[in-house]
A protein has these predicted regions:
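ATP/nucleotide-binding catalytic cores
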Residues: 2-168
């Protein structure tokens, strides 16, 4: 398992570089889900590749975020983790650049079918402009997936981050 950010390097700069380098699956550990999603939306906009941005959680299912106005449209019948991964696999036929942010996927990642699907997707997505980003407060990564998923620890915001977010 490649674990990133044990130093003071900007983790969001690292994530942007990883997306440019076609890293297929990232696992971000943080307690600040909204902040992480907002930063990921900013990265998607900065990469200027017309990314389609999707968000999934086990309560709301899969939604597509409009990067221009921030609205989200939920897709029907994609609530279960296996359905979600099958949907992502089916999208490799399309040429669109896509980011899928999965909240709290650690609850499902140890299930046999999920492990196999994630491994297969990690092997497949590296040839496309599609990325899965797991965002969770808990690092729970099965040994079988350690080679395929890059872990990035997102630190709590520092003084500079807090000052810049309060400046209008």
């Amino acid at each position: 398992m490649a674990q990133i950010n044990k130093t003071n390097i900007d983790p969001y700069g690292q994530i942007q570089d990883m997306l440019k380098a076609y890293y297929p699956v990232l696992y971000l550990t943080t307690f600040e889900y909204d902040r992480a999603k907002q930063k990921l939306i900013g990265i998607a906009k900065n990469l200027n590749k017309n990314f389609q941005f999707y968000e999934w959680n086990c309560v709301d299912g899969l939604g597509q975020r409009d990067l221009s106005d921030g609205s989200i449209t939920f897709l029907e019948n994609i609530e279960e983790p296996e359905q979600l991964l099958k949907h992502i696999a089916s999208q490799t036929e399309k040429d669109d650049a896509e980011i899928y942010v999965l909240e709290d996927f650690h609850d499902f990642i140890s299930e046999r079918n999920i492990k196999i699907q994630l491994r297969q997707l990690a092997e497949k997505l590296r040839f496309y402009r599609k990325h899965i980003i797991i965002v969770s407060s808990v690092l729970s990564l099965p040994v079988e997936l350690e080679k395929y998923i890059t872990v990035v620890e997102l630190p709590l915001p520092g003084r500079v981050d807090l000052e810049s977010s309060t400046t209008v």
